[in-house]
């Protein structure tokens, strides 16, 4: 790929300009909106709306409360909750204090929660009431953890509308008690935009989770980059129905972007509760929706999804996992044509570094680099040689959206962030290629690319073809070392059969026949495993780490 950035020609045609580096904090935007558009709706949760004035006032109360608990600039606050109001209030409060947040997945086991609390040196944790036994149980272990604040799903509801049990235990502080009597005024601390705002842990699907340190500058700049590239993100009004959990970097950036552009953010505690999601979208129809392919498929399987008013929908974003053509076709029939936008990102890149410009979609591609970012394809072996157009290699990205490094892992930081031609590049570990216009096409994770007889087998390509079979609900390709041919892999296929084919005794033979007809011999799986369910991560990605353990 030439280093001339061919996508800039398209950006010139569309009038897309780089936002440069935006040196502001999330809290500064919230405070502006609370002052200038105080009555505008900011949050929607289980039928209740919060104006920007209330959003800012409650965040001020929480900032005062956290300061009373000893939280100071640079201290780490753990956010161990689903998508409830306290999470976004905490983000704003942390930004005001100059503290650091870290999202802790609600589905982690106690030992995993403890490991993250220790690794990030968490001082105070806000924990969901249903999860509080986990954090209370580890509070007495010497980790530096000083307080556990219990956040209930009903703290901001006049009447319970979502059945989520609460738990109040010893050695903890109730959120409502903490907030009682606090002032809704707060003088935000002077915060260096280069300082760390969030420590976001990688999913750990290919190894132990690492804490990516993201500055105020990187997260805010990335929100501007993505919005500048896809103009639909800037169109008012903005009503975002995001299915990403806030502890995930995509959910985090959705919340930050919506706040920056004075939009309304739907807080959905459990996006897998399709009935509740659809009910909320009917109450306040979305202009933007964001989800992984697996969730779109779950939603479309429920008749209620088809009853949502999508007439104002501008864009349906998808990412974090490959999306099949059959899913795209089905979604188009429900939401309307030319609204789906694929993209590509990762925690370490703030997270978005490739999106489709508005109305310039290219089939099979995930888009172009966001405005102000650079992208190259380099050889996997050395990471130094730029690959020609159309030839796959490792995807690397550069720009002001990149992380500052991995917390406490200098070796991993040096391996990921490398200097090349006078720039710092993030080596993503993903394999792809670009065409002559600079559009990026994904092939696979470098770790998921198999070698069979000297040929490269991209698991995503094989999985996508197999998902066209009516008998297959979901599948995953896993490579294992070929003992007979060192340096080669055996292609293993894990299959979750569709409901109507669960008892088909001829399922494996049908799959083999399909493969022989639709792909080269070296790509055909040598071992087929029929399992009850393909494991998924918290955000709906196929959990290949779990499958590898089962091999």
Specify the residue positions occupied by each region the protein language model found.
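Flexible, low-complexity linker/hinge segments
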Residues: 15-24, 156, 161-196
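Conserved AMP-binding/adenylate-forming core of the ANL superfamily
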Residues: 21-22, 39-84, 88-92, 109-114
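Structural core segment of the AMP-binding/adenylate-forming
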Residues: 68-69, 96-177, 499
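AMP-binding/adenylate-forming catalytic core of the ANL superfamily
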Residues: 108, 115, 125-130, 399, ...
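Conserved AMP-binding/adenylation subdomain of ANL enzymes
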Residues: 220-239, 247-288, 302
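Gly/Ser/Thr-rich phosphate-binding loop
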Residues: 286-291, 300-362, 374, 384
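Conserved ATP/PPi-binding loop(s) of AMP-dependent carboxylate-activating enzymes
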Residues: 368-372, 383-417, 455-457
């Amino acid at each position: 790929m030439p280093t001339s950035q061919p996508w800039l020609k398209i950006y010139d045609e569309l009038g897309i300009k780089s936002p440069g580096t935006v040196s502001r904090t999330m809290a500064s935007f919230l405070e502006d909106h609370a002052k200038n558009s105080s009555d505008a709706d900011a949050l929607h949760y289980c039928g209740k709306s919060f104006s920007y004035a209330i959003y800012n006032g409650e965040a001020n109360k929480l900032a005062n409360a956290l300061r009373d608990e000893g939280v100071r600039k640079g201290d780490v606050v753990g956010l161990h909750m689903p998508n409830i109001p306290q999470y976004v209030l905490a983000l704003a409060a942390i930004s005001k204090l100059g503290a650091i947040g870290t999202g802790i997945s609600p589905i982690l086991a106690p030992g995993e929660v403890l490991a993250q609390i220790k690794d990030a040196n968490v001082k105070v944790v806000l924990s969901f009431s249903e999860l509080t036994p986990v954090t209370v149980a580890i509070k007495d272990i010497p980790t530096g953890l000083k307080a556990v604040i219990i956040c209930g799903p009903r703290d901001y509801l006049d009447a319970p509308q979502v059945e989520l049990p609460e738990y109040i235990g010893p050695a903890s502080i109730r959120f409502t008690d903490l907030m009682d009597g606090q002032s809704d005024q707060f003088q935000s601390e002077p915060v260096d935009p280069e300082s760390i705002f969030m420590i976001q842990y990688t999913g750990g699907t290919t190894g132990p989770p690492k804490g990516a340190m993201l500055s105020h500058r990187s997260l805010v700049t990335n929100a501007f980059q993505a919005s500048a590239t896809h103009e639909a993100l800037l169109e008012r009004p903005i009503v975002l129905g995001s299915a990403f959990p806030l502890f995930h970097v995509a959910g985090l950036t959705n919340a930050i972007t919506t706040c920056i552009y004075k939009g309304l953010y739907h807080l959905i505690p459990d996006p897998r509760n399709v009935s509740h999601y659809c009910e909320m979208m009917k109450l306040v129809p979305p202009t933007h929706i964001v989800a992984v392919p697996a969730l779109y498929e779950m939603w479309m399987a429920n008749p209620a999804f088809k009853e949502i008013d999508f007439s104002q929908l501008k864009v349906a974003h998808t990412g974090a996992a490959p999306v099949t053509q059959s899913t795209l076709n089905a979604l188009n029939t429900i939401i309307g044509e030319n609204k789906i936008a694929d993209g590509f990102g990762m925690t370490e890149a703030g997270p978005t570094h490739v999106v489709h410009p508005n109305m310039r979609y290219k089939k099979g591609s995930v888009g172009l680099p966001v405005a102000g970012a650079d992208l190259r394809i380099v050889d996997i072996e050395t990471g130094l040689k730029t690959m020609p157009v159309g030839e796959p290699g490792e995807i690397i990205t550069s720009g002001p959206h990149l992380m500052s490094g991995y917390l406490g892992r200098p070796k991993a930081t040096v391996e990921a962030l490398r200097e090349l031609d006078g720039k710092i590049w993030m080596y993503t570990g993903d394999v792809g290629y670009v065409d002559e216009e600079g559009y990026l096409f994904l092939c696979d994770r470098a770790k998921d690319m198999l070698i069979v007889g000297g040929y490269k087998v991209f698991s995503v390509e094989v999985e996508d073809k197999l998902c066209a079979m009516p008998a297959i609900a979901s599948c995953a390709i896993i490579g294992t070392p070929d003992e007979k041919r060192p340096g080669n892999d055996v292609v293993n296929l894990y299959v979750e059969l569709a409901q109507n084919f669960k008892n088909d005794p001829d399922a494996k033979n049908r799959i083999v026949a399909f493969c022989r007809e639709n792909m080269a011999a070296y790509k055909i799986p040598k071992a087929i495993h029929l399992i009850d369910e393909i494991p998924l991560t918290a955000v709906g990605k196929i959990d290949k780490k779990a499958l590898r353990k089962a091999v």
